[in-house]
């Protein structure tokens, strides 16, 4: 069982919801990425999604696009991100880490070389935004052979055929994009999310994490009521951008603690 699978199994056994924060590797300060990853884990993150900076992040809204640009301007590459994960693993062998990014940096390295390097670094999952599932069976197998979960996106516009395709090749969890648009958008529709999850669950035997548009404890709790996990990205990137350097890690931990408490209150209020 992979680290991601055992994390979700433990959450399910406790009746808890998963909390998956996203941050861009190298932003705001490449020297502090590992420190911020530990701050997320300390706050109660179940899985950490680490964004690999890319020059044309088409699925991302302005907050994460600009974050990616800042990291690239500081020279952060896929190899730097893998080195950060390896350093994180020196003192945390429990929290799963998922790399989220685009195909180009992986293809430049080569899928086999990337799988080997990611395994060596202690990466648990990979989500390549621009790999459609119907063209990704070989990539998924290469990742699985290295013990890495290939994670895929589904959206409100995903057909039953695409959902079934993801069900065949994905592992770990699936990431449901709750809005038609880009990350960080504001209009969250929990009813439409609740309406789509059963169609995914019937075809994909994996936990469903929902992201895009979750900004605070209230929206996180509302989405977690109808899903297995919530993914929060733009708000975290914004928080790190705005915080004074000396208080950034503490603010990050406190923000994650707030979300964690909101998720853990689901079901608790019934008694």
Swiss-Prot record:
Pathway terms, separated by semicolons: Amino-acid biosynthesis; L-tryptophan biosynthesis; L-tryptophan from chorismate: step 5/5
Protein name per UniProt: Tryptophan synthase alpha chain
Active site: 49, 60
Reported function: The alpha subunit is responsible for the aldol cleavage of indoleglycerol phosphate to indole and glyceraldehyde 3-phosphate.
Enzyme Commission number(s) of this protein: 4.2.1.20
Reactions mediated catalytically: (1S,2R)-1-C-(indol-3-yl)glycerol 3-phosphate + L-serine = D-glyceraldehyde 3-phosphate + L-tryptophan + H2O
CDD domains reported for this sequence: Tryptophan_synthase_alpha
Assigned keywords, A-Z: Amino-acid biosynthesis, Aromatic amino acid biosynthesis, Lyase, Tryptophan biosynthesis
Molecular function via GO: tryptophan synthase activity
GO cellular component, one term: cytosol
Positions in coiled-coil regions: none
Pfam families cross-referenced by the UniProt entry: Trp_syntA
Encoding gene, per UniProt annotation: trpA
């Amino acid at each position: 069982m992979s680290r991601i699978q055992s994390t979700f199994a433990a959450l399910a056994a406790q009746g808890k919801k998963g909390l998956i924060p996203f941050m861009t590797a190298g932003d705001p300060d490449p020297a502090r990425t590992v420190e911020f990853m530990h701050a997320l884990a300390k706050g109660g993150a179940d899985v950490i999604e680490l964004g690999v900076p890319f020059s044309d992040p088409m699925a991302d809204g302005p907050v994460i696009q600009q974050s990616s640009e800042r990291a690239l301007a500081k020279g952060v590459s896929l190899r730097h991100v893998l080195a950060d994960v390896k350093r994180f693993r020196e003192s945390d062998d429990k929290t799963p880490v998922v790399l989220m990014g685009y195909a180009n940096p992986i293809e430049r390295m080569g899928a086999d070389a990337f799988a080997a390097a990611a395994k060596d670094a202690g990466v648990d999952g990979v989500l390549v935004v621009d790999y459609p599932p119907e063209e990704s069976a070989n990539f998924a197998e290469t990742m699985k052979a290295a013990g890495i979960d290939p994670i895929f996106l589904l959206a409100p516009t995903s057909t039953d055929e695409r959902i079934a395709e993801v069900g065949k090749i994905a592992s770990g969890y699936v990431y449901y994009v709750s809005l038609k648009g880009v990350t960080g958008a504001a209009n969250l529709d929990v009813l439409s999310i609740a309406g789509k999850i059963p169609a995914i669950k019937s075809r994909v035997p994996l936990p469903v994490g929902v992201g895009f548009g979750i900004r605070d404890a209230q929206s996180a709790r509302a989405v977690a009521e109808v899903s297995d996990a919530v993914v929060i990205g733009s708000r975290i990137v914004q928080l790190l951008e705005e915080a004074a350097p000396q208080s950034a890690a503490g603010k990050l931990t406190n923000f994650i603690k707030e979300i964690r408490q909101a998720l853990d209150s689901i079901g608790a209020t019934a008694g």
